[in-house]
Curated annotation (Swiss-Prot):
Highest classification ranks of the organism: Eukaryota, Metazoa, Chordata, Craniata, Vertebrata
Organism listed in the record: Macaca fascicularis
Keyword Ribonucleoprotein recorded: no
Region named Disordered: 1-66, 333-423
UniProt superkingdom: Eukaryota
Protein name in the entry: Striatin-interacting protein 1
Key words of the record: Acetylation, Cytoplasm, Phosphoprotein
Length: 837
């Protein structure tokens, strides 16, 4: 559905916000009025203009793309995560919630405010509100739910600052959790999901708006606030709050809701929405709640790292060579220097120029700090070619000057310090050592020994040293051990014994997802496609704007601008939630069991996740990351504490003062990490990256000067360099240098050359089918008890016990028993002689 349908006002829903003008140069660089420009008198008019243009281009290139001060974490700041729950269209509902609470509160308490009551009075009133949720009248129930939402929002009408609202919010939410609000809300949510009248009404409606999902939105808002607030740990938390947090996390991940974890109920809402049976579901809130539920029950990335270290010690594996989270946090965005071959190539292209003015040291500094990935805007289209256009448009010192001045002595700064070594310890797989020994034996001795990695008889001394070095850096992953154990279980099902499956939250969640996991993945990717900024509005695509569009479309340009910002923000939040959910599930399933991860990953690949993510990045990614789709004065809790100023076009366009949008950069990094997870060690999927021409798309993403994002882009480029041809590698030496500098080295990995054994013809179907067979065997062995191999089931040989077993016959069979007896027994002749023989 077109967002602008039904309203006369033009709706602005693009991501291209007006950019602020570039900052003026420093005051010291400005000549007084009438004074000649530096160097202008030394060059002819045309050359002077070109020199100044090159200077300006260099300085602008540096000022436009500074290093982004972004710290990757599980979530954004608490206040930001709260504000993203509400769309700006929901603004008037804050006062409705307050009104519903105060009307009910004044009946029972006449002379005091909520903030003036003691804990017992708070608990009494909270339980009274909870009882009100059990009334049958929908309108009364909605009023009580709004009153509870107001309490969860921090009773902001009695607070004077945002900090006070947040403080009361934490207190109120732990109070609501203590009296059992969450379980009552789950029952109500279940009832709303099964509300066939609301579903059929929404299906018949031509245009769905905010009003169609009021009940669901109120319930989901309260539940999200509870999950998000309880999950956030604060230093001043009471001891009982910490205990409640642990209990809540355990309950949320346990199969207590319809014999399934709570996340499965939310996944069911996603699939029901995508199937078209419930188009009124507020999908942004469902996805945000799903993300925070998965995060709360399974744990974040730092918790995952500690779980990984613990699991390695249980399996008897050596500890991890480094903490990847800390290494990435200490990395800086890549600005590799131009190599000699690049400079020579540029000189050959441009030819020797005439004598030029001497270059100041500050220009050299600007050159040193230039972003090597920044290409001219006019060359955006040329990046589809194999040339490294990041080099074009840069004016190198050796070209501009024949007489270089002696460098000035600058004090040592952080940017001039060079790293002492590569950030990552190299790794070697057992398979790599086997391949190296196989090739060495066939070369020097003329025979092979299979998977024997210890016998080195007859091999020269340098080969011995090489093997020693390889074994020093040998890394055995948890996934390899799990795959070997699975092979053992399948090879010897009787002697292997019964597998002990620890019921951790990830295992419980996987068991709940298993029956419908393909549908869940397809539904999430459908919504991701609809929310991507590159997707065009189609009549057959799903409408994800049901919980942002008002009942009456805007009539003024200002209202249209506000709604346009709201719609773009809404889509960005959806992308953020889906990318985070997928990444968390992939990482936790991989730790729990590699075949759980492979099952989910394969269904993502089958649902076209790889081209979808590449399509997402096939846009101006810098514009997406710096988009200002937010109106800070309308963000919660600012909007409920301060008086709202009159909105103008300028205030709408201004956005916030940050140099980037946290949620968009977070989403981009998550999607790159998902792409890495799907393609790592998968030859056929790596070839998909090559076939879909991902290299120029990924190279454009390197313009974002953020170390973590660059690292995952470089990883994706590294795995496909051997297939891109010699000319691409030759033309992209800066990118190759950055890969060498930033990405972990695998000894014996000829990633920079095309002569690797893996650079072979690929058969996508054969590789995926072999993997699928392993996954199906794993799922059948561990989860499909009904279809176990009958040869391995215990046999009851006792006649007494077999005859004594109670068989439950269906009721209709019992009623027509005589008919069955006549047709199946008496009417068929029995050859007793044959039977007795």
């Amino acid at each position: 559905m077109e967002p602008a349908a039904g309203g006369p006002g033009p709706l602005i829903v693009n991501n291209k916000q007006p950019q602020p003008p570039p900052p003026p140069p420093p005051a010291t660089a400005q000549p007084p009025p009438g004074a000649p420009r530096a160097g202008a008198g030394l060059l002819p008019g045309g050359k002077a203009r070109e020199f100044n243009r090159n200077q300006r281009k260099d300085s602008e290139g540096y000022s436009e793309s500074p290093d982004l001060e972004f710290e990757y974490a599980d979530t954004d700041k608490w206040a930001a995560e709260l504000s993203e729950l509400y769309s700006y269209t929901e603004g008037p509902e804050f006062l409705m919630n307050r009104k519903c609470f105060e009307e009910d509160f004044r009946i029972h308490v006449t002379d005091k405010k909520w903030t003036e009551l003691d804990t017992n009075q708070h608990r009494t009133h909270a339980m009274r509100l909870l009882d009100g949720l059990e009334v049958t009248a929908r309108e009364k129930r909605l009023k009580v739910a709004r009153a509870i939402l107001y309490v969860a929002q921090g009773t902001f009408g009695e607070c004077s600052s945002e900090a006070e609202v947040q403080s009361w919010m934490r207190y109120n939410i732990f109070l609501l959790l203590e009296v059992g609000t969450f379980n009552a809300l789950v029952e109500l949510l279940n009832m709303e999901i099964d509300n066939s009248a609301a579903c059929s009404s929404a299906v018949r409606k031509p245009a769905i708006s905010l009003a169609d999902s009021t009940d669901l939105r109120v319930l989901l808002n309260i539940m999200y606030l509870i999950v998000e607030t309880v999950h956030q740990e604060c230093e001043g938390d009471k001891a009982e709050w910490r205990t409640m947090r642990q209990t809540f996390r355990a309950e949320l991940g346990s199969p207590l809701y319809n014999s399934e974890p709570f996340a499965i109920m939310l996944f069911g809402m996603v699939t029901k929405f995508c199937s078209g049976h419930a188009p009124h579901f507020p999908m942004k809130k469902v996805l945000l709640l799903l993300w925070k539920t998965v995060l709360c029950t399974l744990g974040g990335f730092e918790e995952l790292q500690s779980m990984k270290a613990e699991k390695r010690s249980i399996l008897g594996l050596p500890p991890l060579p480094e903490d990847s989270i800390k290494v990435i946090r200490n990395m800086r965005a890549a600005s590799p220097p131009a190599s000699a071959s690049d400079l020579i190539e540029q000189q050959q292209k441009r030819g020797r120029r005439e004598h030029k003015a001497l270059i100041k040291q500050d220009n050299l500094d600007a050159f040193n700090e230039r972003d090597p990935y920044k290409a001219d805007d006019s060359r955006e289209e040329e990046e589809e070619n194999d040339d490294d256009n990041s080099l074009e448009g840069e004016t190198f010192p050796l070209e501009r000057d024949e007489v270089m001045p002696p460098p000035l002595q600058h004090p040592q700064t952080d940017r001039l310090t060079c790293p002492k070594g590569l950030p990552w310890a190299p790794k070697v797989r057992e398979k790599d050592i086997e391949m190296f020994l196989e090739s060495s034996r066939s070369k020097f001795i003329g025979y092979t020994l299979g998977s024997d990695t210890n016998t080195v008889v007859g091999l020269p001394r340098p080969i011995h040293e090489s093997i020693k070095t390889l074994k020093q850096h040998k890394y055995t992953s948890i996934a390899e051990v799990q795959a070997q154990m699975e092979e053992e279980y399948l090879r010897s099902p009787l002697s292997g014994g019964e597998e002990e499956v620890e019921q951790v939250p990830a295992e419980t969640l996987y068991q709940g997802l298993l029956p419908s996991l393909p549908q869940y993945m397809i539904a999430l990717l459908k919504i991701l496609l609809a929310a991507a900024p590159t997707s065009k509005a189609k009549t057959d695509s799903i409408n994800i704007l049901a919980d942002v569009l008002p009942e009456e479309m805007p009539t003024t340009v200002l209202q249209s601008m506000k709604l346009g910002v709201d719609v773009n923000r809404h889509k960005e939040v959806i992308v953020k939630a889906i990318s985070a959910v997928l990444l968390l599930l992939l990482k936790h399933f991989k730790l729990n069991h590699v075949y759980q991860f492979e099952y989910m990953a394969q269904h993502l690949v089958f649902a076209n996740c790889i081209p979808l993510i590449l399509k997402f990045f096939n846009q101006n990614i810098m514009s997406y990351i710096t988009a200002k789709n937010s109106i800070s004065v309308l963000d919660y809790p600012h909007c409920v504490v301060h008086e709202l100023p009159e909105l103008t076009a300028e205030s709408l366009e201004a956005g916030d003062s940050n140099q980037f949008c946290w949620r968009n950069l977070f989403s981009c990094i998550n999607l790159l990490r998902i792409l890495n997870k799907l393609t790592k060690w998968k030859h056929s999927r790596t070839m998909m990256l090559v076939v879909f021409k991902s290299a120029p798309i990924l190279k454009r993403a390197l313009k974002v000067k953020q170390a973590m994002m660059q690292l995952y882009v470089l990883k994706l480029l590294k795995v496909q360099t051997k297939y891109l041809g010699r000319q691409w590698r030759k033309s992209n030496m800066k990118t190759m240098s950055a890969i060498y500098q930033k990405v972990r080295h695998r000894l014996n990995d000829d990633w920079a050359y095309g002569n690797d054994l893996d650079a072979r013809p690929w058969d996508f179907q054969a590789e995926e089918c072999a993997l699928r067979a392993n996954i199906e065997r794993f799922n059948a062995r561990r989860y499909d008890r009904a279809h176990s191999n009958p040869d391995f089931l215990p046999v009851d040989n006792c006649l007494q016990s077999v005859l004594g077993q109670r068989v439950d016959l269906p009721e209709d069979f019992q009623m027509n028993y005589d008919l069955w007896l006549e047709r199946e027994v008496f009417s068929k002749p029995i050859s007793w002689e044959e039977l007795l023989q």
